Every structure is written in structure tokens, then in C-alpha cells.
């Protein structure tokens, strides 16, 4: 079977996009190859090999389209904001569909608006949980659990550049508090309107960006840290 693969990215969060809308057998045929294709060392691609994951555009009985995502390790997350923006743009360009798209995800139906090369997504309402603390060596790490349809743990730090993300990310994600793992955001509030963030994503590792993570950081900032309703979140990818 021949499969056309398109690579797209949302501020550095890169994905392979595959059209499984017209031929549903494409999805099952691609599943065994996900880890190989996404490998940063030997995966698909030239300038930057591999990807953070693969997203499939599929038919839906309850929305315009259905999105199924697999992380680089093959796991299937509930939601990803950046890949949703990419797949909405892909669907619009491929099928010349409406500029307003309803896309089914594991976290529910999300509405996407396409305006030229810009795509916005209504992420829905966050769910907050009580402040938690995790022991790491001789330190207690406070964190704010938030669900944006997928799980996040937001950690406030003084300097995101010096955080050992590749150590603390998997350590927090593997804590019994999060039986299904968690995406971990390390944030510093620069001002009431600016947050700097780095992110460790379950099933991938540190990534250049995370849309749902940026939303989780923004709502934690507003609810607990004194930021304003409108805030700019700066990630490694932009």
C-alpha cells in the first residue's frame, strides 16, 4: 500500500499527517511503523528527521472529521492542540471544506477556525485539581494538575532555562499521582501578561511546543499566579 505522508508543525511541534478519510485501511496499515517513522535519528525526513507524532484524518459519525493521534512511542493521547490546528488546515486544504470545522478527538469535539494560514481552536473548559507536592531528592516540588482534555502538571520555577526537563519531566510523569502519565509544564511568570514555558510530553519527551500545555499554563497563571485574562506564553518553538 502506498501512503502519502505530509509533515506539518505548529510552532515547532511537528507531526506527520496521514489522510485515512477515504481509505480507512490506511490507519491499520501505518500503525506498526509509527515508532520507526518518528525516530529522530533514523526516521522519515531530511532536514529534521522523525516527528513528535503522527495524526490521522479519519471519518466521523458525529463531526466533520475525526483525528487520531499517536505519539512518537506509539501511545495514543487524548488531545493535542498543535496537531489539531495542523490537521484542521490539512482537512481544509484537502477537501476545500468550510473554514469552521468540527473535529472529533478522544477529548470530545473541538471547533477549529481556518483563516488563511492561521488556525484557532476552541480548547474547551479546563478542569482544575488541588495543589499537589512531589518529593524529589531533598526537595518538595509543588505542582498544579490541570486537564485540558489531556492531563497536565504545571510547575512554577525561577528560571526555565536551567530546569533539568529531561530528568524532572519523566520523574513527575511516572509518579503514582498520575497513573496514565502526565504532560509537565515548567513555567516562569515574567509579568501579568507574559509566561515563559518549557514542556515535557509523555510519550515524546521535551518538545518545542505544546498547545494544550500553553493553555494549562495560562489558566494556572490566571487562577493562581495573578496573570491577566489575556497572556502570551512563549515556548522554545515560539
Show which residues each predicted segment covers.
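Short, solvent-exposed secondary-structure boundary/capping segments
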Residues: 117-124
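A glycine-rich beta-to-alpha transition motif near the start of alpha/beta enzyme domains, typified by
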Residues: 1-116, 154-238
Amino acid at each position: 500500500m502506498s501512503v502519502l505522508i505530509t509533515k506539518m508543525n505548529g510552532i515547532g511541534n511537528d507531526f506527520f499527517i496521514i489522510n485515512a478519510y477515504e481509505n480507512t485501511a490506511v490507519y491499520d496499515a501505518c500503525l506498526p511503523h509509527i515508532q520507526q517513522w518518528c525516530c529522530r535519528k533514523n526516521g522519515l525526513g531530511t532536514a529534521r528527521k522523525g516527528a513528535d507524532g503522527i495524526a490521522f484524518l479519519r471519518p466521523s459519525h458525529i463531526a466533520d472529521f475525526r483525528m487520531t493521534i499517536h505519539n512518537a512511542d506509539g501511545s495514543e493521547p487524548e488531545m493535542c492542540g498543535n496537531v489539531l490546528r495542523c490537521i484542521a488546515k490539512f482537512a481544509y486544504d484537502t477537501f476545500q471544506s468550510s473554514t469552521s470545522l468540527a473535529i472529533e478527538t478522544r477529548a470530545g469535539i473541538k471547533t477549529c477556525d481556518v483563516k488563511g494560514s492561521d488556525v484557532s481552536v476552541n480548547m474547551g473548559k479546563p478542569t482544575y485539581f488541588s495543589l499537589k507536592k512531589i518529593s524529589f531528592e531533598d526537595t518538595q516540588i509543588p505542582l498544579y494538575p490541570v486537564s485540558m482534555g489531556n492531563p497536565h502538571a504545571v510547575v512554577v520555577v525561577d528560571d526555565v532555562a536551567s530546569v533539568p526537563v529531561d530528568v524532572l519531566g519523566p520523574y513527575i510523569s511516572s509518579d503514582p499521582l498520575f497513573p496514565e502519565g502526565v504532560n509537565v509544564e515548567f513555567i516562569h511568570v515574567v509579568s501579568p501578561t507574559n509566561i515563559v514555558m518549557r514542556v515535557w510530553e509523555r510519550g515524546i519527551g521535551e518538545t518545542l511546543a505544546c498547545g494544550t500545555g500553553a493553555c494549562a499554563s495560562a489558566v494556572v497563571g490566571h487562577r493562581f499566579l495573578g496573570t491577566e485574562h489575556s497572556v502570551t506564553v512563549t515556548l522554545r518553538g515560539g
